[in-house]
């Protein structure tokens, strides 16, 4: 059995939404018939809400967008319910916020619920809870959400369906010699691609940056990621049967486990700790815990046992972890004279995850 997570972007659910969803449902049903299981992460609530409310244009304020999403989410689920019922498959709605997945207990509850639905042969349809998600804590067009869901359920494959045929070295609409990219094998390749995606232009602002971020999260968790054109719903059926297409992001050879993936990607850092070179070496080479003696600066305001970003002397992020001390306690220790005896542990190695070098 292969466990798939499939993400459908907003751009694919325009026009005749019912016919489009019916096309995707046929491919999903065929996968179920082969014994595979699928989790669907679907956008589209705002657009359907705008249609239902007969709004002349997409709202611009956060409150209006949230209200449109609340109206459209029921419409979206009704379409999936009807389409999958034709194949004898039940669907279940899962709405989450970023803060849900940042809380370890709620993260585990969401994972458990999804696993139970899959055991029952139900198709979970996951979406961000747009009606209540703060603007500053949004996932980013559900790309990040799909990667976090894939990690939470231990998926084998993540498919990101969009309105482009593959990843390119630059925006092919603007750069005539943009090079198509079929495979991405290493995080360093992602670094270079993210640098291009972030340098402006329609390619950088049009959603490719969030797809690269999603690929980084999923591949670090041992999941193969496919970025492919979903404008023809039959393409999903081919991908679910194992056909190659678009761009394939290959999984890291030493994937993070469930907890370490959660530490690295689901948490939102509340502050930063800057480390000296000796502490950086100790973390990378010896797998040590972070001691107070290795910290040179603290930034932000956070309480004990909250997530922080760890950075080296050059400002580059090394990893993330749960800080056992509050920011105030760390600052007091930095301001005080060095204490006699062993240096206290600030981030334990079991609550710490480092990025690949």
From Swiss-Prot:
Q: Where does ATP bind?
A: 7, 162-163
Sorted alphabetically, which keywords does the UniProt record give?
Amino-acid biosynthesis, ATP-binding, Cytoplasm, Kinase, Nucleotide-binding, Proline biosynthesis, Transferase
Query: Record-annotated residues binding substrate?
Result: 43, 130, 142
Record domain PUA: where: 270-347
- One matching Pfam family, short form? AA_kinase
Pathway annotation: Amino-acid biosynthesis; L-proline biosynthesis; L-glutamate 5-semialdehyde from L-glutamate: step 1/2
E.C. no: 2.7.2.11
* The UniProt record lists the keyword Nucleotide-binding: yes
Where in the cell? Cytoplasm
Q: Which family does it belong to?
A: Belongs to the glutamate 5-kinase family.
NCBIfam families per the UniProt record, alphabetical? proB
In UniProt terms, what function does this protein have?
Catalyzes the transfer of a phosphate group to glutamate to form L-glutamate 5-phosphate.
Protein name stated in the entry: Glutamate 5-kinase
- What species is this protein from? Parasynechococcus marenigrum (strain WH8102)
């Amino acid at each position: 059995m292969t466990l798939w997570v499939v993400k459908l972007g907003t751009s694919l659910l325009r026009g005749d939404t019912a016919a489009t969803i019916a096309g995707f449902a046929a491919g999903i049903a065929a996968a179920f018939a082969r014994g595979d299981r699928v989790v669907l992460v679907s956008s589209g609530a705002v657009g359907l809400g705008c249609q239902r409310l007969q709004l002349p244009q997409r709202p611009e304020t956060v409150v209006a967008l949230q209200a449109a999403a609340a109206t459209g989410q029921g419409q979206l689920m009704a379409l999936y319910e009807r389409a999958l019922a034709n194949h004898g498959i039940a669907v279940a709605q899962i709405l989450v916020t970023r803060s849900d997945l940042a809380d370890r207990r709620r993260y585990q509850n969401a994972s458990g619920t999804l696993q139970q639905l899959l055991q029952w042969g139900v198709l979970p349809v996951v979406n961000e809870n747009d009606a209540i998600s703060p603007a500053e804590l949004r996932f980013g067009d559900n790309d990040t959400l799909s990667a976090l869901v894939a990690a939470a359920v231990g998926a084998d494959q993540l498919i990101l369906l969009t309105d482009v045929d593959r990843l390119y070295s630059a925006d092919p609409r603007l750069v005539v010699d943009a090079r198509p990219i079929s495979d991405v094998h290493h995080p360093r390749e992602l670094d270079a691609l993210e640098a291009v995606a972030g340098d402006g232009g329609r390619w950088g602002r049009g959603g490719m940056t969030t797809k690269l971020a999603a690929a980084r999260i999923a591949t670090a968790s041992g999941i193969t990621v496919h970025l492919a054109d979903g404008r023809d719903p039959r393409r999903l059926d081919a991908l679910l049967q194992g056909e190659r297409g678009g761009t394939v992001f290959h999984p890291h050879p030493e994937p993070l486990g469930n907890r370490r993936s959660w530490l690295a990607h689901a948490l939102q850092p509340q502050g930063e700790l800057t480390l000296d070179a000796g502490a950086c070496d100790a973390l990378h080479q010896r797998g040590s815990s972070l001691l107070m003696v290795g910290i040179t600066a603290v930034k932000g305001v956070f309480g004990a046992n909250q997530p922080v970003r760890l950075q080296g002397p050059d400002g580059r992020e090394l990893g993330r972890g749960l800080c056992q001390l509050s920011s105030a306690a760390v600052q007091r220790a930095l301001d005080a004279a060095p204490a006699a005896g062993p240096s206290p542990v600030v981030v334990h190695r079991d609550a710490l995850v480092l990025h690949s070098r």
